[in-house]
Design a protein with these regions (language model features):
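A generic structural motif
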Residues: 57-66
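Mid-chain, well-packed structural core segment of small domains
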Residues: 79-114
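N-terminal, charge-rich interaction modules
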Residues: 2-38
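Ser/Thr/Pro-rich, acidic low-complexity intrinsically disordered regulatory segments
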Residues: 2, 37, 44-45, 140
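Ser/Thr/Gly-rich flexible loops in soluble cytosolic domains mediating phosphotransfer, phosphorylation
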Residues: 51, 108-142
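Structural motif
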Residues: 74-81, 136
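Short catalytic helix/loop segments, enriched in acidic residues and glycine
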Residues: 38-57
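Short beta->alpha junction loops
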Residues: 67-76, 128-130
Length: 142
């Protein structure tokens, strides 16, 4: 299974206790030269991970308890996300642009939205537009 889960610790401030699940495609599995990813010039796996990690650290510094959940393109994605949802109650679920904006990933996006709706109906959704604006997306909602 090609997944990666990382956790950060929350700091004591106004956002302490707010938990966030960051869901996205595992960048190591993405072919950034494919036409579907032409909208993201210069992106590669290392840049995506660096952006996600930096924003995860930024959220932790703001007091959020964050967990990153990286999935494949659908073979195990639902099971991987469901496992995270069963481990913890999240206040906010962020689903990355790689899942949402690539037309071939539309069905995966739809499945993940319905999965979260069923297993975490209280959670807010937020959406980033690139790996480096995840913190802003979270802060809009919690």
């Amino acid at each position: 299974m090609n997944t990666e889960t990382q956790s950060t610790t929350r700091n004591a401030n106004a956002t302490t206790g707010k938990s966030v699940l960051i869901v996205g495609l595992d960048p190591a599995l993405i072919d950034f030269s494919a036409p579907a990813f032409a909208a993201f010039p210069g992106m590669n796996a290392a840049r995506v991970m660096a952006g996600l990690t930096a924003d995860q650290e930024r959220l932790a510094a703001l007091g959020y308890d964050t967990r990153m959940c990286l999935t494949d393109f659908g073979e195990t994605a639902e099971a991987v996300v469901l496992a995270q949802l069963k481990q913890k109650q999240f206040d906010c679920i962020m689903i990355g642009a790689g899942v949402r904006v690539i037309p071939t990933h539309f069905i995966l996006f739809e499945k993940l939205i319905n999965l979260v709706h069923e297993h975490a109906p209280h959670a807010r959704f937020c959406f980033n537009t690139k790996p480096t604006d995840t913190a802003e997306a979270v802060q809009r909602w919690i």
